[in-house]
Each structure stands twice: as structure tokens, then as C-alpha cells.
A protein has these predicted regions:
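Glycine-rich loops and low-complexity Gly/Arg-rich segments
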Residues: 46-50, 75-79, 116-120
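C-terminal regulatory domains involved in ligand/effector binding and gene-expression control
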Residues: 1-74
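Glycine- and Gly-Pro-enriched alpha-helical subdomains that act as flexible
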Residues: 94, 101-125
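Conserved interaction-surface patches within small, structured recognition/assembly domains
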Residues: 64-101
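Generic structural "secondary-structure junction" signal
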Residues: 45, 55-57, 74, 81, ...
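Solvent-exposed alpha-helical segments within well-ordered globular domains of core cellular machineries
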Residues: 30-37, 81, 110, 114
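Conserved, well-folded catalytic cores of nucleic-acid-processing
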Residues: 42, 82, 86, 118-123
């Protein structure tokens, strides 16, 4: 399964909320943690940093993780599904800066997915 080869970013606006997505090369959980810390610092105004990763452990086994960071609509799982569908290893993260309008679980999930697809489509593989 191919890794994400280079950092690829994409952002969208949905009803004044900003969604900043990145497909990030990461081979280990330690790299995932470091990259997440960078994203949280870069987008410090974001209320949510949802992410999913597929990396290898020390024995070469595939490890999958996803986090919603308190966001509704299970965006972490939507991001993990995108990594699975594209058969990619690495980190997919989306940071949301709330714009004052609630999108509801369906709208939030769609917005996270659209932002992440944009990052993948900009050839981060």
C-alpha cells in the first residue's frame, strides 16, 4: 500500500467555518503525534483537529487510528475511510475554525470529507 509522499494541503469555507486539510507523510505513530502538534500550533484558533492515520508498527503491522476531537458527525472515521478507499498510509488531518453557524452532523461530516478530498486530490501521493 503506497504512502502519502508529500505534504498536500487544501482548505474550504462552509457557512463561514474554515476547514484546513492536509495529507501528511507519516510512517509511525510518533511522526503522527509530531505532525498533529504542528497543525495545532499552526491553526491555534481551530476548535477541532480531526484526524485519521494508517501507519506501520515496529513489527510491520498496519495500525489505524481516528479521532473526532469532540466534533459531531464522526469526521475522524470519514477521514479513515478516505485513507482506506485510496489504499494510502500516512496522516489525514482537518482543522476547523468555527464560523458561528452550526452545520449539523451531516453538514460537518460532508465538509470535513470535502476538505480532505481536496488535500488528496492535490496529489499528496
Amino acid at each position: 500500500m503506497p504512502p502519502i509522499l508529500k505534504l498536500s494541503e487544501h482548505d474550504i469555507t462552509e457557512q463561514r467555518s474554515r476547514f484546513f486539510a492536509a495529507a501528511v507523510p507519516a510512517a509511525t505513530l510518533d511522526q503522527v503525534k509530531k505532525e498533529l502538534a504542528k497543525r495545532k500550533k499552526k491553526y491555534h484558533k481551530a476548535r477541532h483537529h480531526c484526524w485519521a492515520c494508517r501507519v506501520r508498527d515496529d513489527d510491520g503491522r498496519l495500525v489505524e487510528q481516528a479521532r473526532d476531537d469532540g466534533e459531531v458527525g464522526r469526521p475522524g472515521m470519514k477521514l479513515l475511510e478516505l485513507l482506506r478507499q485510496n489504499d494510502l498510509e500516512g496522516l489525514l488531518v482537518v482543522s476547523r475554525i468555527f464560523g458561528g453557524i452550526k452545520l449539523g452532523p451531516g453538514g460537518v461530516g460532508r465538509a470535513f470529507r470535502a476538505a480532505a478530498l481536496g488535500a488528496l486530490d492535490t496529489k499528496g501521493r
